């Protein structure tokens, strides 16, 4: 049901049902700039039709019956079995069913809105798993991330396996997306496979086109705007200011980045590494871990170098291996760092 609340009556006045509106619907929204209240997955007067879109007459939420003198109407979508989500976008409203994506655009009399299917097999995973950011809409699907900026395509991701191989889709309705506009980021919170509550996040940076992952319990989020900092709430209702300090409520915020494995001569030769040249802008200190292995299926050997700071010019090492990766990690309070180019002094060490 759809309700209205008149603020002029004060906070003690209860919201009242709009009895002329569909008696059941999946969700509703107001379109702009044409100002129509729209019900998605609406009751048609006889039954609840989860693929039906209905709208009232312009600026009159009590008038839902189409006539020659109003702009009320309806449209039954095809492609799917139920409407999952809807969102205002640039000059249109995007509608996701459980399989497809549709565009709803205001075209004026006599039809009021025009509808077009813009994609198939691109469903959104939940009703809150999308965001609109600078004219672009991105969302989490069932096996991919998607982007729509006038054309629909898969958003390339380096963390697809990490996310979608360990996700609890039974609790998909709890998945939600938010923005961190200050850093050009969109973040999704979701349940890992072993959890029934939100316990992980995945973040995408639009400018740097970089993905990050982590663990955090946030069931709701609002970006900075009226509030000075982004605010998130956990499952217990505790609110947190985010992006305020480099710590996690006074405790060190553990962070790391790890490279893929590198080799030389297409893996035919061993490497002998003699020096790491750090390239950091930072405060605090961090650790470098060099992981090597002699054969692709062999166990990695880790060599740790601690206490790296912005004044560390080089780290002398003597490490051999056929494949190598480097991990950079911080676990101290007030630590803030950015990493530049990876520089290793490497020379071939034979074909063993």
Task: Set out the residue ranges of the language-model regions.
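Surface-exposed flexible segments
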Residues: 5-10, 46-63, 107-109, 192-210, ...
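Beta-sheet repeat architectures centered on beta-propellers
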Residues: 121-136, 142-352
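Elongated alpha-helical scaffolds
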Residues: 1-2
């Amino acid at each position: 049901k759809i309700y209205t609340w008149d603020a002029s009556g004060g906070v003690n006045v209860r919201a009242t049902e709009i009895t002329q509106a569909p008696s059941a619907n999946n969700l509703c929204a107001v379109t702009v700039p044409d100002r129509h209240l729209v019900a998605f997955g609406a009751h048609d007067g006889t039954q609840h039709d989860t693929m039906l879109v209905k709208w009232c007459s312009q600026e009159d939420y009590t008038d839902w019956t189409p006539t020659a003198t109003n702009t009320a109407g309806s449209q039954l979508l095809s492609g799917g079995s139920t409407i999952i989500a809807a969102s205002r976008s640039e000059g249109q409203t995007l509608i996701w069913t459980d399989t497809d994506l549709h565009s709803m655009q205001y075209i004026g009399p006599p039809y009021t809105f025009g509808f077009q299917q813009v994609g198939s097999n691109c469903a959104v995973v939940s009703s809150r798993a999308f965001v609109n950011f600078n004219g672009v809409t991105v969302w989490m699907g069932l096996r991919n991330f998607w982007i729509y900026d006038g054309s629909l395509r898969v958003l390339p991701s380096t963390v697809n396996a990490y996310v979608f191989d360990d996700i609890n889709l039974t609790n998909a309705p709890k998945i939600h997306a938010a923005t961190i506009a200050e850093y050009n980021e969109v973040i999704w919170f979701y349940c890992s496979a072993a959890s029934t509550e939100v316990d992980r996040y995945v973040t995408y940076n639009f400018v740097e086109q970089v993905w990050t992952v982590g663990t955090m319990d946030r069931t709701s989020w609002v970006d900075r705007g009226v509030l000075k900092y982004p605010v998130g709430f956990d499952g217990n209702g505790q609110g947190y200011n985010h992006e305020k300090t480099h710590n996690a409520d006074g405790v060190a915020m553990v962070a790391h980045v790890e490279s893929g494995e590198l080799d030389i001569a297409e893996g035919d030769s061993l490497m002998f590494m003699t020096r790491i040249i750090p390239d950091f802008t930072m405060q605090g200190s961090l650790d470098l871990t060099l992981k090597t292995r002699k054969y692709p299926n062999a166990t990695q050997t880790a060599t740790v170098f601690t206490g790296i700071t912005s004044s560390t010019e080089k780290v002398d090492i003597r490490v051999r291996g056929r494949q190598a990766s480097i991990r950079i990690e911080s676990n101290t309070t007030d630590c803030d760092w950015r990493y530049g180019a990876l520089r290793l002094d490497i020379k071939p060490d034979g074909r063993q």
